[in-house]
Amino acid sequence: MSQVILDLQVACEDTTGLPDEAQFQTWLNAVVPQFQEESEVTVRLVDEAESHDLNLTYRGMDKPTNVLSFPFEAPPGIDMPLLGDLIICRQVVEREAREQEKPLEAHWAHMVVHGSLHLLGYDHIEDDEAEEMEGIETEIMLALGFDDPYIAEKA
């Protein structure tokens, strides 16, 4: 299986307790090579202000969010392995993990898996799309040794 080329950018003021590059690499490699042979992904870890600005600019949502996915679309006739960018907000991920009573590492992994599937074209707007995407996420999370991230919703 091929490895994803990772460009990790840390733009958080406080970097204490963030997952390391090897963890992000493991999580990306659990997703992307199943769907695409050669890929490059940028993962940018940000604080709430940057997440809020990007979420407002690109989604019209006036708040920070856990993960934003920006797929790269190469111009016609140009073949590039760049899959896109994931922007992950440290504070939102940490808050959600506490609120949902999930291990922090598992929630970080879930955000990478979830965001990567968006880069690959998956979505969860329609119920059938959500069911398919959540099923893939669950399989990958279990393969990584984490619990089903949607177990509370299924109870």
Swiss-Prot record:
Main location group: cytoplasm
Pfam families: YbeY
PROSITE patterns in the cross-refs: UPF0054
Cofactor remark from the record: Binds 1 zinc ion.
Keyword Acyltransferase (UniProt): no
Binding site for Zn(2+): 114, 118, 124
Cellular compartments annotated: Cytoplasm
Highest rank taxon of the organism: Bacteria
Entry annotated with the keyword rRNA processing: yes
Cofactors named for this entry: Zn(2+)
This protein's GO CC annotations: cytoplasm
NCBIfam families membership: rRNA maturation RNase YbeY
Record-linked PANTHER family: ENDORIBONUCLEASE YBEY, CHLOROPLASTIC
Family: Belongs to the endoribonuclease YbeY family.
The protein's name: Endoribonuclease YbeY
Organism from which the protein derives: Cronobacter sakazakii (strain ATCC BAA-894) (Enterobacter sakazakii)
